[in-house]
């Protein structure tokens, strides 16, 4: 789980900003907190409110950049993806800093790094304990210092120690050490790297980033057409949200007649042929529809996802293409796998513009379902929004509500409602927010200039 996230000098964040999911001392809505892990309580959700272009999406991108650099790394010869605050000449020369405080496998870790386009300047991983911190590794590139003494103690055999020392020295200056550990088959050479595995696994399997145009787990959606248990779950949620859709079904179609450009067809076939299995498959979203594609005996076979609707005048059903459904229904198809994963536990979802294409009441119900059915699991839902109706203390605790602001000189900053304002637990926040009492809303200039502009059109 994510307990804290820190970002500095990234996109519109000039200064150090701290996002904390540690709960305040309030006793309301105890079900919004996880069970204590090593004496640490963590909030299960947080909503970031703010005006357009205020920095909300940059906040999500900041969380994503660490995941990207850990999992994908930087290609040999390329510069690191570096996006400093550009409205300050000083900041363009400074490093970006990204820090995660996470709880996983009953331990608390701090993983962070500072970097620029040319190098990872600092990188460290610590286990945070009550009495003292344990440095698992740390590096400072410019001083050519790399401390892996803790890992060497855990792996005292000469060949293991030699391999770890070699790996540390061989880590390129534009690459994170954590990425090197992940990308090399280190388990064949080193026996005890549980701490590294835990943190890498958190980035790989727990942290999920979803942007407005990001489909989530399309394969699960297609699998739901054939898997009875998934089909039942999808159908129940689609009916619960009153979409008019009763389920999903796959029908065979001719891949060659889908209108896919020849170069894309060749690329798909090449990708599928790289699979080591006898029957390779993948998903394809094309022309507003979703397909399951297989490579069988060198030929691409395709199945199209259809939605099932009951006819009003008999017991038969009608099949619709996904492209025939509303934007809201299509977006809900992305969220149903998310909901199922949240309830199962072990996931940290960070969603940008969660309300996109969905009615506010539906979003509120998704959040309510999450709180109700995830009491005993360690999942988190963090999202950005400018939907004011969600700023509601019947839905959230005060310490779950965050406000994103951008100054007149383009600097974004954020803060938590309970730290910024002394509001009663029963105060209706929406009207105060819309009236600009908390900031984080659009600020308009005087109309003098546009009045002159519009007058020229008459």
Language model feature labels by segment:
Residues 1, 93-97, 116-121, 298-304, ...:
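A short, compositionally biased
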Residues 37-41, 47, 51, 60-120:
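Conserved P-loop NTP-binding catalytic core
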Residues 1-15, 148-167, 285-308, 443:
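An N-terminal domain-start capping segment
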Residues 216-324, 447-448, 452-453, 457:
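Extended helical coiled-coil dimerization/tether regions that scaffold
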Residues 1-71, 302, 306-446, 455-458:
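Switch/communication elements of ASCE P-loop NTPase nucleotide-binding domains
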Residues 80-84, 286-289, 383-387:
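Short Pro/Gly-enriched beta-strand edge/turn motifs at strand-loop
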Residues 12, 104-108, 130, 312:
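Glycine-centered tight beta-turn/hairpin loop motif at sheet-sheet or coil-to-beta transitions
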Residues 110-270:
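Electropositive, glycine-dotted interaction segments
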């Amino acid at each position: 789980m994510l307990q804290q996230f820190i970002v500095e000098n990234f996109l519109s964040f000039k200064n150090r900003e701290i996002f904390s999911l540690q709960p305040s001392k309030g006793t309301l809505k105890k079900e919004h907190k996880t069970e204590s892990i090593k004496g640490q309580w963590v909030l299960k959700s947080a909503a970031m409110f703010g005006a357009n272009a205020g920095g909300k999406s940059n906040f999500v991108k900041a969380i994503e950049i660490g995941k990207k650099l850990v999992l994908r790394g930087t290609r040999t010869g390329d510069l690191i993806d570096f996006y400093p605050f550009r409205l300050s000449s000083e900041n363009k020369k400074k490093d970006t800093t990204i820090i995660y405080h996470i709880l996983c496998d009953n331990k608390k870790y701090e993983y962070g790094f500072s970097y620029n386009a040319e190098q990872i300047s600092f990188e460290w991983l610590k286990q945070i304990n009550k009495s003292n911190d344990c440095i698992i590794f740390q590096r400072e590139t410019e001083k050519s210092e790399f401390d892996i003494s803790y890992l060497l103690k855990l792996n005292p055999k000469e060949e293991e120690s030699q391999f770890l020392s070699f790996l540390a020295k061989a880590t390129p200056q534009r690459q994170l050490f954590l990425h090197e550990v992940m990308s090399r088959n280190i388990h064949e050479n080193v026996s005890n790297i549980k701490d590294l595995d835990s943190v890498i696994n958190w980035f790989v399997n727990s942290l999920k980033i979803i942007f407005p145009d990001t489909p989530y787990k399309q394969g699960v959606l297609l699998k739901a057409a054939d898997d009875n248990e998934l089909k039942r779950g999808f159908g129940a949620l689609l009916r619960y949200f009153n979409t008019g859709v009763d389920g999903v079904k796959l029908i065979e179609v001719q891949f060659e007649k889908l209108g896919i450009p020849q170069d894309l067809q060749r690329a798909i076939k090449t990708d599928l042929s790289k699979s080591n299995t006898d029957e390779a498959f993948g998903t394809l979203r094309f022309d507003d529809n979703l397909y399951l594609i297989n490579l069988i005996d060198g030929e691409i076979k395709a199945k199209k996802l259809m939605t099932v609707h009951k006819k009003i005048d008999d017991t038969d059903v009608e099949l619709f293409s996904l492209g025939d459904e509303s934007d809201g229904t299509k977006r809900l198809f992305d969220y149903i796998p998310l909901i199922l994963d949240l309830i199962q536990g072990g996931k940290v979802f960070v969603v940008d513009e969660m309300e996109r294409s969905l009615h506010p009441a539906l979003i509120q119900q998704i959040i309510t379902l999450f709180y109700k059915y995830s009491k005993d699991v360690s999942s988190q839902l963090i999202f950005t929004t400018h939907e004011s109706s969600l700023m509601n203390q019947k839905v959230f605790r005060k310490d779950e509500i965050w406000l994103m602001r951008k100054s007149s000189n383009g600097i974004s900053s954020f803060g938590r409602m309970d730290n910024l304002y002394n509001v009663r637990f029963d105060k209706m926040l929406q009207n105060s927010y819309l009236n600009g009492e908390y900031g984080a809303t659009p600020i308009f200039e005087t109309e003098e200039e546009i009045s002159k502009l519009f007058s020229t059109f008459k």
